[in-house]
Swiss-Prot record:
GO terms for molecular function: identical protein binding; polyubiquitin modification-dependent protein binding; single-stranded DNA binding; ubiquitin protein ligase activity; zinc ion binding. Homodimer. Interacts with UBE2A and UBE2B, one homodimer binding one molecule of UBE2B. Interacts with HLTF. Interacts with SHPRH. Interacts with SPRTN; leading to enhance chromatin association of RAD18 and RAD18-mediated PCNA ubiquitination and translesion DNA synthesis. Interacts (via C-terminus and phosphorylated form) with SLF1 (via BRCT domains); this interaction is required for efficient repair of UV-induced DNA damage. Interacts with SLF2. Interacts with SMC5; this interaction is increased in a SLF1 or SLF2-dependent manner. This is E3 ubiquitin-protein ligase RAD18. InterPro entries: Rad18, Rad18_UBZ4, SAP_dom, SAP_dom_sf, Znf_RING, Znf_RING/FYVE/PHD, Znf_RING_CS. It catalyses: S-ubiquitinyl-[E2 ubiquitin-conjugating enzyme]-L-cysteine + [acceptor protein]-L-lysine = [E2 ubiquitin-conjugating enzyme]-L-cysteine + N(6)-ubiquitinyl-[acceptor protein]-L-lysine. A motif (LR motif) lies at residues 232-240. Coiled coil: none annotated. It comes from Mus musculus (Mouse).
Amino acid sequence: MEVLAEPRWPPGLAVMKTIDDLLRCGICFEYFNIAVIIPQCSHNYCSLCIRKFLSYKTQCPTCCVAVTEPDLRNNRLLDELVKSMNFARTHLLQFALESPPISPVSSTSKKVVVKVHNADAAQHPVKQANRLMDKFLIRETGDCVFELLGKENERKFSPQKELSTSAEIKETSLLGKPVLGLSDANGPVTPSTSTMKLDTKVSCPVCGVSIPENHINKHLDSCLSREEKKESLRSSAHKRKPLPKTVYNLLSDRDLKKKLKQYGLSVQGNKQQLIKRHQEFVHMYNAQCDALHPKSAAEIVQEIESMEKTRMRLEASKLNENVMVFTKNQTEKEIEEVHSEYRKKHQNAFQLLVDQAKKGYKKTGRVSQAAAMRTDEPAETLPSMRTDEPAETLPSMRTDEPAETLPLMRADEPAETLPSECIAQEDNVSFSDTVSVTNHFPQPQLDSPGPSEPERPDDSSSCTDILFSSDSDSCNRNDQNREVSPQQTRRTRASECVEIEPRNKRNKN
């Protein structure tokens, strides 16, 4: 919402800026609206501002003293001061604008007064010089200076006197001896008996407070009016009670809508919007409870509805700024112009998105290159198998091969028929993933599936129930490092099976 800027204080009234700042709220920086005071720290704020702040933090915004809403108290004096300040502000600004600039005559007249005073001081005594200067001031400035000097004398004699009584004393004292009274102002001040008599105090018959005699009439009027106000307040209705706080987490949507309907608020929107609407109503209602003449609930509801409409209008205007709008009657040329204007308007945003995409592409490219380099490493870089690993880590034989391809040695053949090529070579044994298949079986047998091997009885020799010696173990490791033909594979398998003996025969031997 657009708010008209307040006019600044002119240089001649710069002193008023301090008073202006003291009459403003420390939260909204506007003039106090239903001012309330925090008794713990004596800081003042608008009632609505401090209640909204306390809904988030229960402390003073200035000094962080712990405060709750029931601790707040009205400060009617600040409200009256704000009203007087707004009234005086317009008149002071108008007076400052309409008053003519200061003429140089006043400065020359002051110089003349100083010169005359110095000349008289050299020729005559001090009292006579003061009298001449007073006469000169009265002749130059007229009645205005005469009245101002009279007021100063009266303030020195009796500072508690009112303007009405001081005006009467001024006329009687100054009309008799105008020059002598003015000359006495510059000399030593000696209180007279007439002024001492005016300081006598009299007790008020209503409240019993001792009041100066010249103020007793005004005090009596205020006392009597105060008693009438008290009686009228007692007879009038009691102060409006504020609404209690609501725990929204425990309320269902149905109960929340029921509360809104109770005060005449709208029930449209989701739960968060309903909660926000109810909170605003409670804050404004409780703030008006502190006012001398609070607004009704219907007026507060109207204000909330107008605020929501203004907020929605602003949000819609912001959305329309970032959206291209077309109509059916627009030509292709007009549509292209809208597109070009949109591109020019959001060129910086487009460039920012392009830069972000390029940075992300560079990062992903580096990651993909590093992954490709890892996959292209040769197989020789893999760690070699340790020679002391057990035989179970060797690749196992496929069970789907035909039994005819596995030549078995007779059990009664001696073990000395082992081939000479099965010599242990335990240094630098290495293997690859494909060795486990090509070293033991020919390619035709791998391509053509065969019948599964039939089950054998327990008393016959099986490949699972074998005992490996150190010679056969070294032979197996040696075979993995060489490419062999199918015939050599059969011979190697035959030599390996020499060690295989049935358990019954092994026990007999």
